[in-house]
C-alpha cells in the first residue's frame, strides 16, 4: 500500500503556476502596517472633530456675549415701513380731526376712545 500512495503522489504533482497563484491567493502577511495606518487615520478624524466642536462651542459662547440690541438690516427696513405707516396714519388723523363736520345741535360727537368700542365687537359676544 505504501507503494501505491507514493505513485499517486508522484502523478498528482501540481504545476508551479498554480502553486504561485495559490500562494498569492492564500497569502498571510504581517498586518501591522495596515493596522497602524487605520489607527493614525482614526486619530486624525477624532482630533479634527474635537477641533471643530471646540470652535463651534466658542463661537456660540461669543455670540451669546455680544449685545442683543444690534439691529439687522431687515429690522431697520421693517422699522422704516412702520414709521412711514404711522406717519401716514397720523397725517390722516390730523386732517380728519381738523376738518370738523357741521353737526346738528344735539348730535353727539364721537371721540377717539368711543370709536374703538364702535368698531370692535365685545369679546363676550364673539364667544357665544
Swiss-Prot record:
The chain crosses the membrane at residues 31-53. It is a single-pass membrane protein. Disulfide bonds: none annotated. It is found in: Cell membrane. Residues 61-80, 101-128 are annotated as: Disordered. GO terms for molecular function: bile acid transmembrane transporter activity; protein heterodimerization activity; transmembrane transporter activity. Present at high level in ileum. In ileum, it is restricted to the apical domain on the mature villus enterocytes with little detectable expression in the goblet cells or crypt enterocytes (at protein level). Expressed in kidney but not in heart, brain, liver, spleen, embryo, lung, thymus, ovary nor testis. Residues 66-80, 101-115 have a biased composition (Basic and acidic residues). GO terms for cellular component: basolateral plasma membrane; membrane; plasma membrane; protein-containing complex. Residues 54-128 are cytoplasmic. Induction: Positively regulated via the bile acid-activated nuclear receptor farnesoid X receptor (NR1H4/FXR). Residues 1-30 are extracellular. Keywords: Cell membrane, Lipid transport, Membrane, Phosphoprotein, Transmembrane, Transmembrane helix, Transport. The keyword Acyltransferase does not apply. Its main location: membrane. It comes from the Eukaryota. Interacts with SLC51A. The Ost-alpha/Ost-beta complex is a heterodimer composed of alpha (SLC51A) and beta (SLC51B) subunit; induces the transport of SLC51A from the endoplasmic reticulum to the plasma membrane. This is Organic solute transporter subunit beta. It comes from Mus musculus. The gene is Slc51b.
